[in-house]
Amino acid sequence: MKSIEDELRSALHEAAIEHFGDGTEIEGLVKLSGGASRETWSFDAAIPDGGRLPLILKRDPPSDEVTDGPTGVASVLGVDRWTEGRLLELAGEVGVPVPRVHFFLAADPRTTAGFVMQRLEGETLGRRILREDAYAEARP
C-alpha cells in the first residue's frame, strides 16, 4: 500500500507533466506545519529545460468524514480550493503581488482538491512579524 506522500507525489507528477512537459520530476515533497483548514506542501518541480521551480501545494486535508467535490471542500470562509486559487489568479491580473498559480488538482482517489502555486521566501509566523526587530519596517 502506498503512503499518503507517495500517492500525492504520483498525482502531482502527472499534473506537473501535463503542465510543464514530459520529463518533469517532483522532488523534495514535504508537508509544512500550520494550516488549520487546509494542508500546505512544499516541493520543487525539476522541469525538462533543466530548471527548478520552487512550488507550494495548498489542498484540503484528507478526511473520512467529509466528501469533497472536484473543486474542494469549502472552508469556514465558504471558499473551496479552486475558488481560492482562482481569486489569487484574478488578483495577480490586476496588479496585486501574489504567488503565481501554476495548476489545479481535482480530487481523486489519491488526493483531495488543491492548487499549485509559486513558492516565495519569507516569514509566515505572525508573532515574529509583530515582535521581531527584523520586521519593524513592515509594521505600521
Task: Describe the function of each predicted region.
Residues 30-140:
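ATP-binding pocket architecture of kinase catalytic cores
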Residues 1-25, 29:
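Juxta-kinase regulatory segment immediately upstream of eukaryotic protein kinase catalytic domains
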